[in-house]
A protein has these predicted regions:
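Conserved beta-strand hairpin/beta-sheet module of binuclear metal-dependent hydrolase folds
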Residues: 2-58, 141-158
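Metallo-beta-lactamase
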Residues: 91-150, 247-256
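Cap/insert and terminal regions of metallo-dependent hydrolase folds
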Residues: 162-255
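Active-site metal-binding motif and surrounding structural segment of the metallo-beta-lactamase
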Residues: 42, 48-97, 176-179
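Active-site metal-binding loops of divalent metal-dependent hydrolases
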Residues: 10-11, 42, 49-50, 73, ...
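Divalent metal-coordination and catalytic microenvironments
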Residues: 5, 46, 55, 72, ...
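Short amphipathic alpha-helix with an adjacent loop that forms part of the alpha/beta core around
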Residues: 56-59, 120-125, 167-172
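Residue-level recognition of the N-termini of beta-strands and the immediately preceding loop/turn
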Residues: 3, 65-66, 93-95, 217-223
Length: 258
């Protein structure tokens, strides 16, 4: 069975003013929205300030969403008001899967599912999710999300620099089919975010080692996301930079088969 990942947003927190202008009701690769994605039309990954608009632009059925998976609680990924509004559209409410230590407000229509690290959870008969440790601000309860759909494996690894040792060894020989990697910082050295976000030079070092360790295969598609436009060249140029080390660049509205 083929699955689909829809990128609803691919930005870090420096949003373009064009989102309130000519890109108000359309996607543009150089006017990115808050990072979020939709798996198989019913599994939402993060819900930030722009997620409802992105769902509408993509003509996705928000009422069909059953589960929301949270990477962490920074406001560009976690908007409680938008989550409540989304839950009100669903038929049976919304399950919110979050790290066990996440501090969350009460949200009407939302059932919180607490996730311990490195423990697989059966979401339903076809999907399993595992939260992995991520190198990001601890107070936001960060986790990367490993999804297994039958024989397919997807790692959604935004907001976290490098790889935490336990996560790296957990993923040894995982042979991911799809990797969504944090690429907040562009193609230059010396950025201070090295302990919480990846840069292009960091990814150049990481990807060959991930292949050596079996985390990814030769045929694994690696998409860079969570890009800060103020730290990157335009999308078309970034695509060429990423291609030079075997990666692709996600854009809002992009649909990827799995």
């Amino acid at each position: 069975m083929e699955h689909e990942l829809l990128f609803l947003g691919t930005c870090a927190a420096d949003f373009s003013p064009r989102l309130k202008g000519d890109c108000r009701d359309r996607f543009d690769p150089d006017a990115r929205r808050s990072s979020a994605a939709l798996l198989d039309g019913r599994y939402l990954i993060d819900c930030g300030p722009h997620t409802p608009d992105a769902l509408a632009i993509a003509e996705a059925d928000a009422g069909a969403i059953t589960d929301l998976f949270l990477t962490h609680t920074h406001s560009d990924h976690f908007d409680p008001a938008n989550i409540e509004a989304l839950a009100a559209l669903t038929r049976d409410g919304l399950r919110l899967w979050a790290s066990a230590e996440a501090q969350l407000p009460g949200m009407k229509g939302v059932t919180v599912m607490r996730m311990e690290k490195f423990t697989p959870y059966a979401v339903n008969g076809e999907l399993t999710v595992t939260g992995l440790k991520a190198n990001h601000e601890k107070t936001t309860a960060p986790q990367w999300l490993l999804f297994t759909l039958g024989e397919k494996k997807l790692l959604y690894a935004l907001d976290g620099a490098w790889y935490v040792n336990e996560t790296y060894y957990f993923l040894r020989n995982a042979g991911l089919d799809l990797l969504v990697a944090d690429a907040t910082v562009g193609d230059y050295d010396g950025d201070y975010r090295v302990a919480e976000h990846n840069s292009i030079p960091m990814l150049r070092l990481l990807l060959p080692s991930l292949r050596t360790f079996g985390v990814v295969k030769e045929e694994t598609r690696v998409f860079l996301s969570h890009l800060a436009p103020s730290l990157h060249r335009p999308h078309s140029e970034t695509e060429k930079i990423a291609a030079s080390f075997g990666a692709l660049v996600a854009r809002d509205g992009l649909r990827v088969s799995l």
